[in-house]
Amino acid sequence: MGSVSSLISGHSFHSKHCRASQYKLRKSSHLKKLNRYSDGLLRFGFSQDSGRGKSSSKMGKSEDFFYIKVSQKARGSHRPDYTALSSGDIGGQTGVDFDPATPPKLMPFSNQLEMSSDKGAVRPTAFKPVLPRSGAILHSSPESTSHQLHPMPPDKPKEQELKPGLCSGALSDSGRNSMSSLPTHSTTSSYQLDPLVTPVGPTSRFGGSAHNITQGIILQDSNMMSLKALSFSDGGSKLAHPGKADKGASCVRSPLSTDECTIQELEQKLLQRETALQKLQRSFDEKEFASGQTFEERPRRTRDELECLEPKSKLKPPSQKSQRTQQVLQLQVLQLQQEKRQLRQELESLMKEQDLLETKLRSYEREKTNFAPALEETQWEVCQKSGEISLLKQQLKESQLEVNTKASEILSLKAQLKDTRGKLDGMELKTQDLESALRTKGLELEVCENELQRKKNEAELLREKVNLLEQELMELRAQAALHPAPLGPPGVGLTFSEDIPALQRELDRLRAELKEERQGHDQMSSGFQHERLVWKEEKEKVIQYQRQLQQSYLAMYQRNQRLEKALQQLARGDGPGEPFEIDLEGADIPYEDIIATEI
């Protein structure tokens, strides 16, 4: 018998990368592929040991793709086996979770009907994957997703086919059925859709009734519908759940502003819509290609199967052969018609979805173009505001530094003012002491002047007295020379002669005292004059120092007032104004007009 299964390769395509992402998850560029080979034998199990088993599909996950692992578990009830699914990457992306109840349980019909000796019911069997034999090898290259199927060796002898020891009542197909390897799942969230095609093979050589054939057709149609629904759900899963599909490869961004985050979300949604639309388009193309290929391969496979059945059906009567061939052809025609109707319905739904997505895409593009100028304007305003904020911060730092320097300067000036006030108080005390000493000296000087005046008066009196005595003496000498006196008693003349030297001595003594008094008066007057000059110089020095202290005190006071006003302006938040002067009482008095305390 000829080959029954068909090999239809899925075409993978990659979705677009998220353009807004600044950090991409870079993985290895080497694509890992999992090739699964099957020998193409259709085994029909009628025994209780090996023919009754349950095929449980397990979904395994590798780094770059999902695959379905088929394992055989023996059970005791009469139940058909389930086949492995080859519909591409289940889920499409790494972050998608599947519910076990979501995809229906698939029961693909093997298109070969076999009647057992005990019961006349039709039993569908599953494809049992085994290792490839030397005759049929499926080559898959990592550079391409296409697969080549090599021809198989000629049919096995009938003795091997009909051996009851291998499998009771089982038939083997000489053609090798091969299932395409599961497609790779790249790290850029790409997925493949491989349409599931259930081959239609000839019916069993042991015959069958129309009722059994009808039951097989109904069962096979339900399985085909389940497979198509699963394939379509795989193709449109990203459209139904765009948020889940992007969890695995979500983009990481730094914190942005509200407007920028909104624009970023809109761009991501637009990219998701574009990706979903492209995937739907490619899925539609793949399904269309698969349908065309199926329609083209069906007549060829039918002819091949008929040619293979001809040499083996010579032992059967011609009526049974024609009946079997007619049943197979009718079954194939019905199946092709059903598939055609299903594909047309899927095409119409996909076209409607494509129109809807194109409309949404155009609306998103219009929104993007409308938001672009507003976004640019907002970004420009944000840049300007950030520049102004940085400038204000710099000015604030400079103002704080200036305030700190002014405060330190004010503290130093206050300390200097305190020291100057202490010195001024000390000088005032010293000035008061000097003034009191000057007053006492003035009083002493007045006393000395009064004493000098008294001495002068006494000296004048003594001088007048001496002049009178000298005049009397000259008169007496003149009289004595002109008129000698008569001799009188000796005692009188002797007394008079003795009185003259005494008077002369008294006169000399008085003259010496007068000279001494004059010298003392001159010395005292010169001393007083010198002391007066010294005290006058000291007074001038004290007055000069007082004027300097008053001037420095006024300058310090004005400077403190200016600094206090500047600090008040800075505390109120006003800018530094123009330099100002302080109007104080007596602040504009010139240096020459400052009068010291009266001494």
UniProtKB/Swiss-Prot annotation:
Q: Where in the cell is it found?
A: Cytoplasm; Cell membrane; Cell projection, Dendritic spine; Postsynaptic density
Disordered: annotated segments = 135-190, 288-324
Record's compositionally biased regions (Basic and acidic residues): 153-162, 288-313
Keyword flag Flavoprotein: no
Chief site of localization:
cytoplasm
**Presence of the UniProt keyword Cytoplasm in the record:** yes
Question: Could you describe the post-translational modifications of this protein?
Answer: Phosphorylated on serine residues. Hyperphosphorylated by the cAMP-dependent kinase PKA during cell-cycle progression.
Instruction: Tell me a GO biological process for this protein.
Output: regulation of postsynapse assembly
Cite the entry's keywords alphabetically: Cell cycle, Cell membrane, Cell projection, Coiled coil, Cytoplasm, Lipoprotein, Membrane, Myristate, Synapse, Tumor suppressor
> What InterPro entries does the record tag this protein with?
LZTS
Give the Pfam families listed for this entry. Answer: Fez1
Q: Which residues carry the N-myristoyl glycine lipidation?
A: 2
> Where is the sequence biased in composition, kind Polar residues?
174-190
* Gene Ontology CC: one annotated term: cytoplasm
Provide the coiled-coil residue spans.
256-572
Protein function: Involved in the regulation of cell growth. May stabilize the active CDC2-cyclin B1 complex and thereby contribute to the regulation of the cell cycle and the prevention of uncontrolled cell proliferation. May act as tumor suppressor.
Per the similarity annotation, which family is this? Belongs to the LZTS family.
Q: How does it assemble?
A: Binds EEF1G, TLK2 and CDK1.
Name it: Leucine zipper putative tumor suppressor 1
Q: What is the lineage of its organism?
A: Eukaryota, Metazoa, Chordata, Craniata, Vertebrata
Q: What gene does the UniProt entry assign to this protein?
A: Lzts1
